[in-house]
Amino acid sequence: MLGTSTKCSKRDCNYAKENISRIMPTIGLGYKQNFEKKTADTQSSCKLLLVALLESFCKHSDQTPEQSKQMFLYVAHSLQNSGIIDFEFSEELEPIRNAYADSLHNLLSKAFRSTLPMSSTKDSKKSRYSSPDGVLAKTASFLSVLSDGGYEDDVMNVKPSVNVLSNRLNHLPVEALESCFPQTTLESSTFADFCEHKDGTGNLSFSNFDSFPTVQRSRYASDFEELELLGKGGYGSVYKARNKFDGVEYALKKIPLRLRSFSTSSNIFRESRTLARLNHPNVIRFFSSWVELLPSSEKQIEEEPLASADETLSQSADIDNFMFDMDTGLLQHTYPSSVQILFQEDSVADDLTPCYSTKNSTCNLTDLFKKEADQDYAESHDCSSTTSQVDTLGKLAPTKSASEMLLMDSFLSEREEDECSNIPSFDQQPLCLYIQMALCEETLEKHINRRNKHIHGVMSKGLRNCYILLFARILEGVLYLHDAMHLVHRDLKPRNIFLSSGVHSEPCSVCLPNFSDEDNVEVSNAYEPVNQRTLCVVPKIGDFGLVLSQSDNLEEGTNSSAESSFVGTSTYAAPELFSKHMRSVMNNNSSTDIYALGILFFELLYPFNTRMERASAIANLKKGIFPHDFLDSMPEEASLIRSMLSSSNKRPTAAQLLTSNLFHDLVVNELHVYQALLEDAEKRNNNLKAELNILRVLNPNYDC
């Protein structure tokens, strides 16, 4: 309750409004953008649901499939011209519309089954007839006819489907229905007109309702055999799967989704749309993508956090995830929905994953109001009520502003929450976006980690040339993205560079040493492992989940995830992306990719003993400090890296890098690399011969 006097009540209202106006500016930007984004997503979801129902209605007409589609497009275009919908009727969103229809179908089935226990006895029926909920009681009476004959057992053994209902209604006399609904006639009902057909005996047949359109059977389950989990990324998980028809193994990326998060401006399809347009030897190959409902038996993905359409959960095997509030600068320990920067640190242990929550661990508005209330009202002499004004804030007089509505929404009563919790969510069954790509199990990160177990410090010139050529191939792929496709990757790092097996004659292939996984391998004075072989690989850029077009205007529209937050890997993030003022301007600038490539190039050329050494060296590198042995042995490479890590307007482009002295003649450079590899092989053979001669001297009886 509020205060015991009208004077106190008015003061309570004024006090609450003053607190709202005082608190909201400090948190207003984050909540305002979050509120506007949720509102836009809700409106778009409503439009998708409307179009899904319209499409289902057209499919139930007595027309041919072609005529039904034409009828659907005619009505959809009319609604679009009226401003009611946008492009929710487009062909690419058809799987989403089918999922909406199927989810509504499942919800109706659950609602139908929830009424069955109400019709267990005749006495309970009579009491319900006299209750205020007369309509519900009569509905339960009608449904009790269906429950006879073991129907409840059938419900437990079959999937929720309107087909079960239609099978019970096929031979149900119309009089039985009319006795339950005397005030209406089925002939005049719009729903009955939609689904009613009568056979020769006058019985009702729900053949159209029986053919309610649902999402097709799982293409993934029928066409692919899942082999193993390859890894987890920001949006979903990647699995190795074999196609049952061609026998080829592919990489299948699964991105769990929620229906309510879909919108026509959604970026959730950005990766598949981008991959479908790309065609370059140094870019991962794309085959197909589709959306389908997750089967109820597939528990593994359902237990994972579901990605919304415009948010990314960087939940891969990375232990250090930082989040900074853009308005307050406070470090958050969870994943709130307010304005934030989310950076993904490098993995330390594959079995460590962060825990997510929707609540902030910083300032709590309720506690803040309560402290101020105790302080202010302790000096008050006019109020006779001792009831906490904070506890009753949600029951104040209605307000008009959106900021007050946001605050009021956080004070819902427990009773309202309990009542709502008993009703199932419309989109409880999650969707999944599948992206089928070429399989590349080896990544540059894995190769570098193996190499660093064998080589420490500065490498020989021959090996350096190998990695310089490898970096040139990566630059060619980045040049294609920037200049030909006008895209910014935004997450270039060794983990997102895949190494596909190739041959010497294949374009864009590079010969690299094949280091073993053993930790204790003998290393010579020339920093060359005694036992190693060469392999040919083609570097391919992958993981386009954060890609943006250079032409995107990030300053327009509050629904852009790029505007509200930046998601990436902090080790490779350009410094301007840490500034909230520069982020909206530089987030889709190609210079941010060049900065990440500068860090990557340094890692390629300079092996580290430990992770701590790597972190310290990269931190110094960002300050312009190079290791002394790196500067002495590679001055030209150091100069190039320094230019790539300079201010954004001074960084070279990918084209300028490829025309630099270090990469000016790739053909000649490639010949030097192969010549260096040959010299290294001859050197290793001579070392082996020397070791054999020593063994013969030490053991004359040794036969080799």
From Swiss-Prot:
It is an enzyme of class 2 (transferase). InterPro entries: CC_SR_Kinase (IPR050339), HRI2_3H (IPR054521), Kinase-like_dom_sf (IPR011009), Prot_kinase_dom (IPR000719), Protein_kinase_ATP_BS (IPR017441), Ser/Thr_kinase_AS (IPR008271). Autophosphorylated. CDD domains: STKc_EIF2AK. GO terms for molecular function: ATP binding; eukaryotic translation initiation factor 2alpha kinase activity; protein serine kinase activity. It catalyses: L-seryl-[protein] + ATP = O-phospho-L-seryl-[protein] + ADP + H(+); L-threonyl-[protein] + ATP = O-phospho-L-threonyl-[protein] + ADP + H(+). GO terms for biological process: negative regulation of cytoplasmic translational initiation in response to stress; signaling. Its EC number is 2.7.11.1. The active site is at D491 (proton acceptor). One of its GO terms (cellular component) is cytoplasm. Keywords: ATP-binding, Kinase, Nucleotide-binding, Phosphoprotein, Protein synthesis inhibitor, Serine/threonine-protein kinase, Stress response, Transferase. Gene3D superfamilies: Phosphorylase Kinase, domain 1 (3.30.200.20), Transferase(Phosphotransferase) domain 1 (1.10.510.10). Induction: By heat shock and arsenic. Residues 224-667 form the Protein kinase domain. ATP binds at L230, G231, K232, G233, G234, Y235, G236, S237, V238, K253. Mediates down-regulation of protein synthesis in response to stress conditions by the phosphorylation of the alpha subunit of eIF-2 (tif211) on 'Ser-52'. Protein synthesis is inhibited at the level of initiation. Activity is inhibited in the presence of heme. Belongs to the protein kinase superfamily. Ser/Thr protein kinase family. GCN2 subfamily. This is Eukaryotic translation initiation factor 2-alpha kinase 1. It comes from Schizosaccharomyces pombe (strain 972 / ATCC 24843).
